Amino acid sequence: MHCPFCQNPDTKVIDTRISDDGHSIRRRRVCPKCSKRFTTVETSMLLVTKRSGGVEPFSRDKVISGVRKACQGRPVREEDLKLLGQKVEEDLRSRGLAEVTSDEVGKAILKPLRDLDVVAYLRFASVYQNFAGLEDFQSAIDGLRE
């Protein structure tokens, strides 16, 4: 790591801490040449491959936004949505992959959403799984009853 003050290529790490969400590392560094201290933050990037073939960074906010639409008019708090987004991201990152498909993201949303609100689950599943008719809804409802 180059010192941002004097561009010395050799710096020393004096403190390392993992962030609260566990997805980034904060390092406090010192430059032996100019003695200035600075902080770096290291994060790993999780990429999502879309059905169209495009690739974009994973966005917890995008997950929350999609689930929020399914929860519209339901007694679901914003804190619950944020927690669901965190659970989905943790699930995907725990797989140890640098890239996941949008289908895997959708599947990762279903379980925590089902636990949160079954009506919102049915709404989300109907779009995600492309329900064609009442039979698909009935099948999903039967699955919830099991």
Curated annotation (Swiss-Prot):
Necessary cofactors: Zn(2+)
Domain of life: Bacteria
GO biological process, any: negative regulation of DNA-templated transcription
PROSITE patterns, alphabetized: ATP_CONE
Keywords linked to the UniProt accession: ATP-binding, DNA-binding, Metal-binding, Nucleotide-binding, Repressor, Transcription, Transcription regulation, Zinc, Zinc-finger
The keyword S-adenosyl-L-methionine is annotated on this UniProt entry: no
Free-text comment on the cofactor: Binds 1 zinc ion.
PANTHER family (alphabetical): TRANSCRIPTIONAL REPRESSOR NRDR (PTHR30455:SF2)
Family of this protein: Belongs to the NrdR family.
Biological function: Negatively regulates transcription of bacterial ribonucleotide reductase nrd genes and operons by binding to NrdR-boxes.
Protein name, as recorded: Transcriptional repressor NrdR
Organism per entry: Bifidobacterium longum (strain NCC 2705)
Lineage: Bacteria, Bacillati, Actinomycetota, Actinomycetes, Bifidobacteriales
